[in-house]
């Protein structure tokens, strides 16, 4: 889905959008070289230098993303903002968010999703780094200078020009003027011209039809031109863009390469022979050492096997020890619980507070029993008195009813 959307965006922007990343990457690399990124970043981080299309094409996403974060942090710090150097195990989403926030703080707009930067390549990556590089150049007050073109050295013969010398352009102008003057001075005889053309036609018709070839020798022609040039006082300026000059330079360079190749080939052959001899010596020495150490190697292998067996037995024993250690820990925990319970019960038994409370309760009970006995005695005494009183009243009443009859008669 992302590839389709990217293709739609490229179609909307035009056919050159696919190559925009390459142009931005080349500009970015030039700016990084101006900022000496090779000395300040690559050597400190022990990294390889960037190619012309490093961030424009996908190669290794992890390496490209780490390089992008490293360069972005370095450029932000160089532009005057504090930014910590990202590490390999940092969260990439958090790192990208911090980089985009710094980009917004410089006043640039971010109209693309952060996932484009997570890939480590593309136009957006080049755009972000290019913006940071521009801010660094502004921060250090860098100004672009006008290009200086190399001056072409002219021959001494061409520098000193005489007023009488003519250029080819002047000669052509003069010839054209003379032709025009002749045309104006002399009238043209049409009849004579027609007669001459008829004669020429008859002559040409009489000749056999064949290809006309020039019999002029090129070398003689060049010699004649060189001989006549001083007399004509014509100055021919050499053009550095002439293909003949380039061909001569190519031949010169080729001759130089051939001569250098002959010398270098001898040195390379000698070096090849020395390297081959050294390799033969190394291989023979290696075989000798292997033969000498064969017995020790066998002993080492046997000892290695014994060591592996001992390690296996140790692992088995350590497994049993671990199990027993776990059981011992459980038993120790249970023992601690029992000890704690015994201590709690012992402390409760040796404590005198409950006994004092019991004694106080017994004393209180005895006091209450004494009070109850007293009350019981009082009640019994009261009851006895009331009983005796009733008996006395009853006896008195009985005596009152049994009055003797004699006493009644006397009355």
Curated annotation (Swiss-Prot):
It comes from the Eukaryota. It is found in: Cytoplasm, Cytoskeleton, Cilium basal body. One of its GO terms (biological process) is apoptotic process. Residues 317-408 are annotated as: pDED. Keywords: Apoptosis, Cell projection, Cilium, Coiled coil, Cytoplasm, Cytoskeleton. Residues 161-185, 261-351 form a coiled coil. InterPro entries: Intra-flagellar_transport_57. One of its GO terms (cellular component) is cytoplasm. Pfam families: IFT57. Required for the formation of cilia. May also have pro-apoptotic function. Belongs to the IFT57 family. This is Intraflagellar transport protein 57 homolog. It comes from Xenopus tropicalis.
